[in-house]
Amino acid sequence: MTLTGRATASADGRDSTEPRIAAGEVHVWVADPDALDRDGTLGGYRATLSQPERDRAAAFRSEADRLAFEAAHGLARAALTWCAPAVTADAWRFTTTPHGRPEIVGQPPLRPLRFNISHTAGLVACVVTLGAACGVDAERVHRRADPLRLARRVCSPAEYARLVPLDDPDARADLFFRYWTLKEAYVKARGYGMTLPMNECDFEIAASLPAGTPTTVEGRSVARFGPRLRDDPARWRFAQWRPGPRHLLALAVRREPGLPCAVVVHPAPPPLP
C-alpha cells in the first residue's frame, strides 16, 4: 500500500464535473462530530440527509449518538460529492445488501464508487474508492476495560496468547482494540458483517503505533486467514493509525490487480459546494 500523505485543500485545476478520484486511490476523511456541530458544518450535512436517514437519527435517545450518526452519514454524502462533483450531496441514493452493507444506487457496473463509514464517541470516518471493496472502523479505546472475555471469541489463538501475558491493562486494551479495528474493517469490506468468523483473522502487528500517520499492515507475514474465510490475505491491504490520543482507525482495501493502493488522508472534512 502506498501512502501519499495528506491531500491538499487547493483547487486542482480540473473541470468541476470531472471525478476527483482514480482507480487505485483510497480517500479517507475523519472528523469530530462535536467540532462539526460547533462550526456549522453539521448543519449543512444534516440538510443533505434523506428522510429515512433523518428518521433513523431522530430515533436515537442519546444526543451524542444522534450527532455521530448525522455526522457520519453527512460526511459520506459530502465525500462522495467531492469524489464525483457532478452529483450533489443530497442526490445520492443508497441501498443495503442482505447483510446491511450500504451501496450506492444507479451506478455503472464498471468501477463504481465504493464507500464505508464508521462512527464512535468523538470520531466519524469515511473511506471512498473507485471499484475496490473497502472498510473502515473507528474506535475509542476504553483503557479501563478488560477485553479478555470478548477476545476469547473474536481473537485468533495466537492473538489471544499475545494479550494474556500483558500485565498493564492499558497496554492490553490498546492491543485488543488494534486487533478489533483491523478485523472490523475487514469484515465490513467483505460485506458480510459479523457473520464472518473474526477469530479466523490473525494479525501479527508491531507493538507501537505512531499518531497521525497511517501505518501499513499487509501481506501474508502479518495477516493470516483461516479456511472458513475462503479468502487470500495477499489480496488485501490494511492500514491503521491514531487520529487522536483516544482513538484508533483501521482501513481494509481489496487490492485490484495491476493497480496501486494509494491512501490519501484528507486534512479536513469536505465542504459542501
Q: For each predicted feature, which ranges?
A:
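Core catalytic alpha/beta fold that binds nucleotide/phospho-ligands
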Residues: 1-273
